[in-house]
């Protein structure tokens, strides 16, 4: 028997290695809009997770969102093919879950177009056919309603049989708000608040498999 009937995944830093893409995008954005400001790669990696519009409003307060967001979007799309990479064992793990009758899906703060492109780049578009982007849901993570949408889609009613997998504090808060278990991957250079207490800390997909499958 499996511990979960439905496993939902974050995207950036969880099923797709987008760290280099995020860093490169923000370096280019700063060069255009804040040329005197220098951010380290480590600082920029913390921008992975929170809704991008919130990050842009915080980092570029002198520019209206309707100017800075299209600039970010255009720059980032130009970096996808070269800078987004696969993580090891992701596809194999997802296929194993599916073969064991476990349903899988993605909930991300990316918009659906970028999410679909990311899935294609990391060769998961033939594995994941349910992906909720920011434009598919009433509000971005950590608002929990998208998990309710996913449960309804998969006809899952018991929240104790749902696991959300992410890589940062936002993902933990999201799962907690929804009342489902959370697994946090620790392989990225992330910082976690002391309140971040997922059911599972996992260093890779092998450990995730052990948590999900009995």
Where are these regions (language model features)?
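Asp-based, Mg2+/Mn2+-dependent phosphohydrolase catalytic module
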Residues: 1-5, 95-98, 112, 116-214
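N-terminal helical cap/lid subdomain that shapes the substrate entry/recognition surface
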Residues: 2-91, 96
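Conserved SAM-binding loop
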Residues: 15, 86, 104-107, 139, ...
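Small/polar loops that bind or transfer phosphate-bearing groups
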Residues: 17-18, 48, 106-107, 166, ...
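Residue-level detector of short coil/turn "hinge" positions at structural boundaries
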Residues: 37, 63-65, 104, 126, ...
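Short, acidic loop-to-helix structural element flanking the phosphoryl-transfer center
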Residues: 78-106, 112-116, 144
